[in-house]
Amino acid sequence: MEGGGGGLGGEPGLLQQILSLRLVPRVGNVTDCQRATLCSFPEMWYGVFLWALVSSLFFHIPAGLLALFTLRHHKYGRFMSVGIFLMGVLGPISAGILTSAAIAGVYKAAGKEMIPFEALVLGVGQTFCVLIVSFLRILATL
């Protein structure tokens, strides 16, 4: 187990694969793709979905904590933070699964490989689009 390895036959360990953006473990994978790319549908889907989930939590956790802090003395307002936390998780789980699968399906149908940075951009882009639409909907009600 030198160098953070721990896999079979010199393969990197699970933690090292996740930290190096190789999100889906490749044990005994005999594909033609390069090691630095995501080439199968589950790898692409999982990569985009995880980045969408993490970036959503990155925005919703501070917003929920801010709501909890500012509305802590309000009778019903303090429960608003629970809704914010739930939307930070349920939004990517419900819609993020579908949109990430659609993105991965387009890449797979086109026969393209996805580099991990593309998964990051597409996942964070989904969250950014949701934030823009949410902000514009709230702004329209004022």
Swiss-Prot record:
Lumenal side: 1-48, 100-114
UniProt family annotation: Belongs to the TMEM170 family.
Record-given protein name: Transmembrane protein 170A
Cytoplasmic membrane side: 70-78, 136-142
Annotated disulfide bonds: none
Keyword rRNA processing: no
Biological-process GO terms, alphabetical: endoplasmic reticulum tubular network organization
Cellular localisation: Endoplasmic reticulum membrane; Nucleus envelope
Its job: May regulate membrane morphogenesis in the endoplasmic reticulum (ER) by promoting ER sheet formation at the expense of ER tubules.
Topological relation to the membrane, as annotated: Multi-pass membrane protein
Naturally occurring in which organism (per UniProt): Xenopus laevis
Glycosylation sites: N29
Keywords assigned by UniProt, alphabetized: Endoplasmic reticulum, Glycoprotein, Membrane, Nucleus, Transmembrane, Transmembrane helix
GO cellular component: endoplasmic reticulum membrane; nuclear envelope
Transmembrane regions: 49-69, 79-99, 115-135
